Amino acid sequence: MPATVDIRRAADRGVTTTSWLNSRHSFSFGDYYDPANTHHGLLLVNNDDEVAPAAGFDTHPHRDMEIVTWVLGGALAHRDSAGNHGVIYPGLAQRMSAGTGILHSEKNDSTTEPVHFVQMWVAPDTSGIDPGYQQHQIDDALLDGRLQIIASGMPGHDAAITIHNRYAALHVARLRTNNAVELPAAPYLHLFVAGGTLALEDAQGALSTGDAVRFAPSEGRRVTAVEPSEILVWEMHAALGSSRG
């Protein structure tokens, strides 16, 4: 099967807008449903959310899902039924394992400034695990401009936080102008431009904030920052339905 490189532009994402929320969906989510756009590899959700001051998501349930949150600006307060609570901000990675079931809320911790974050969902490779929570500060690790593994379940990975899927890993990089990184080689890879502008090797047109690229497979291509940029990269060695067992 030939390799595919599917560039998805920011303007083509699904949108949910309320009085307090502006959410842009890379995949089907909520009222936005496209049967041809439900996931890529193991990644089910890649939501780019902005929440108004003092607002947020009231307590709601999740089950059998690994949920990773990465804040781009502001501060997000988390509280769940397992007794975990905390405030996450740029440079601090968070993972919540829903497992057999968990309730949680997410609120903007500021009364004056919005909070902007990306939330990503990956199915675990084993259902019915205990709910769990982990967060870790990785700001310093991002200073060198290289891809850093911040969340992984893959054997041999030294990640800041763990996820319960041995076929998936999330990498993050903050790139200075003209810095380049080589993307991991994997059967499935999802690149999301959290901020900035980049050039993708052997592709026409720049990648801008909110754009995404879906590789199947990826083959170690390079991306170069045209301006200071931040990228989120999911490396996946299975597709939905093939990693459970």
Segments from the language model and where they lie:
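Jelly-roll (double-stranded beta-helix
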Residues: 1-245
